[in-house]
Amino acid sequence: MEGKPMRRCTNIRPGETGMDVTSRCTLGDPNKLPEGVPQPARMPYISDKHPRQTLEVINLLRKHRELCDVVLVVGAKKIYAHRVILSACSPYFRAMFTGELAESRQTEVVIRDIDERAMELLIDFAYTSQITVEEGNVQTLLPAACLLQLAEIQEACCEFLKRQLDPSNCLGIRAFADTHSCRELLRIADKFTQHNFQEVMESEEFMLLPANQLIDIISSDELNVRSEEQVFNAVMAWVKYSIQERRPQLPQVLQHVRLPLLSPKFLVGTVGSDPLIKSDEECRDLVDEAKNYLLLPQERPLMQGPRTRPRKPIRCGEVLFAVGGWCSGDAISSVERYDPQTNEWRMVASMSKRRCGVGVSVLDDLLYAVGGHDGSSYLNSVERYDPKTNQWSSDVAPTSTCRTSVGVAVLGGFLYAVGGQDGVSCLNIVERYDPKENKWTRVASMSTRRLGVAVAVLGGFLYAVGGSDGTSPLNTVERYNPQENRWHTIAPMGTRRKHLGCAVYQDMIYAVGGRDDTTELSSAERYNPRTNQWSPVVAMTSRRSGVGLAVVNGQLMAVGGFDGTTYLKTIEVFDPDANTWRLYGGMNYRRLGGGVGVIKMTHCESHIW
């Protein structure tokens, strides 16, 4: 009775029961009885299984062609279905079956301009809520999802294509996104193209661009080039790729090359002497304009325009990645990144495996995740993350043995995996990865077995700090000399620590948090290699075992961990001048035993994903 006042019975007749009153008083709150009437016991119940089980049964009915009331004819394929299911999932079908269209009365409906297999996949999704987007179907699946107005599948296809972006295909993906009005994918493809222009200009796709799209690209202020010479060379290569067709378009395209920003030597010696430039009056005029700009600095304020505006400098900054770990009683695969320029934590692509006790480091601007524990098994697999594509790859060779609570660092172009445990014993084994050979090789073992060890690289040496020998936490420290392939014992820490955080900051090694024999630690200390001594540093505000430690844009940051009671997502930053730690926001996920890594990224890169 929407919109009408509620009426309640207050006159209870002699001998009436609560049910009598309820049936007589048909208006009012049906769940509330009048005063004086005993309230019956109630237990609201919502089934989590019901939607899934109902969908499973309806899908079985479809497969057995039971209660189907429509047949979709797509090419040579006939697909049996239920109008109500199609209408519930697709605005396209809802309009078709509930309006006055002829199809609303037909039992067979012909669907044109759609791929048979794509339609099958989308109908399967309507009945199962599951679909697999892959390289072989995305180009037919996205147009089909657009036609049927399945926004969720459109987003999934675009997300898949975002992860496939590469300098060799970004222009094709951009055109595909433009055709199907995928604005977010178009934006990201544009950003990717601008940032990777030096590689994109070498691709076949670049050479096949129509003139208007080439102009769109080279007109961008955010084009990432070392100098305007690269833009000019790219344009001339594009023209000469199909010279008869494109020669007349050269003046139009050259207008968007910022010739006044070229060096005088290049402008005169290369641009001005090029036969294609010399033979065209409009091109010669553009060269003369640039010469005047360079030769008459006093007149430059009067000559400002799009061609004299410098490309925006590409700002570089460091971005912190938090990888895997243990959260809410289970290993996790999630990864997030912190950008100091925006002061924001954002989720990025997850690893293919859950990893706690994972070793993380950065080599050649790629983030490596080594070993760990997935909640049931010890791992020797390795994954590699490319921030340019927001994609993890698993084609990295595995370590020779399973390792969790492993220390990982980069020295001399190699990735080192130090210690850890394999599920049977604590390890002193050390091996290093050569990315050129995709191969791990054993090097000298440590003198002590160490799990929960922290590692750092300083002065050409690899340091293994603390950890546990499988029985007790350690305060001992070893240093590896790659020239000698030997480990040497150095001064011990003041405190025994396992599962600590370690990083190099201001030419000293900082060791923070961890756990001793009895409790999680908030204390910190640092090592001076010049004196071979450890000295105490002010304690963090929280106890943190399984903490990550990293230096980001000159700031020492302690990330996550466990305080003895709670998994932490908070961050602390060390202020060396004030000799204090201060809280600095928090991650999206609580993380114990996760890894951290820092990658220097351009401003453009850091805002793509």
Curated annotation (Swiss-Prot):
Kelch repeats lie at residues 319-365, 367-413, 414-460, 462-507, 509-554, 556-601. GO terms for biological process: cytoskeleton organization; Golgi to endosome transport; negative regulation of apoptotic process; proteasome-mediated ubiquitin-dependent protein catabolic process; protein K33-linked ubiquitination; protein transport; protein ubiquitination; response to interferon-alpha. The keyword Protein biosynthesis does not apply. GO terms for cellular component: actin cytoskeleton; axon; Cul3-RING ubiquitin ligase complex; cytoplasm; cytosol; dendrite; Golgi apparatus; perinuclear region of cytoplasm. Coiled coil: none annotated. The keyword Phosphoprotein does not apply. Changing residue 148 to A: In KLHL20m6; abolishes interaction with CUL3. SMART domains: BACK, BTB, Kelch. Induction: By hypoxia. GO terms for molecular function: actin binding; type II interferon binding; ubiquitin-like ligase-substrate adaptor activity; ubiquitin-protein transferase activity. Keywords: Actin-binding, Cell projection, Cytoplasm, Golgi apparatus, Kelch repeat, Nucleus, Protein transport, Repeat, Transport, Ubl conjugation pathway. Residues 170-272 form the BACK domain. It comes from the Eukaryota. Pathway: Protein modification; protein ubiquitination. It is found in: Cytoplasm, Perinuclear region; Nucleus; Golgi apparatus, trans-Golgi network; Cell projection, Axon. Residues 68-135 form the BTB domain. Component of the BCR(KLHL20) E3 ubiquitin ligase complex, at least composed of CUL3, KLHL20 and RBX1. Interacts with PDZ-RhoGEF/ARHGEF11, DAPK1, PML and CORO7. Interacts with F-actin. Interacts with IFN-gamma (IFNG). Interacts (via kelch repeats) with IVNS1ABP (via kelch repeats); this interaction blocks the assembly of CUL3-KLHL20 complex. Substrate-specific adapter of a BCR (BTB-CUL3-RBX1) E3 ubiquitin-protein ligase complex involved in interferon response and anterograde Golgi to endosome transport. The BCR(KLHL20) E3 ubiquitin ligase complex mediates the ubiquitination of DAPK1, leading to its degradation by the proteasome, thereby acting as a negative regulator of apoptosis. The BCR(KLHL20) E3 ubiquitin ligase complex also specifically mediates 'Lys-33'-linked ubiquitination. This is Kelch-like protein 20. It comes from Homo sapiens (Human). The gene is KLHL20.
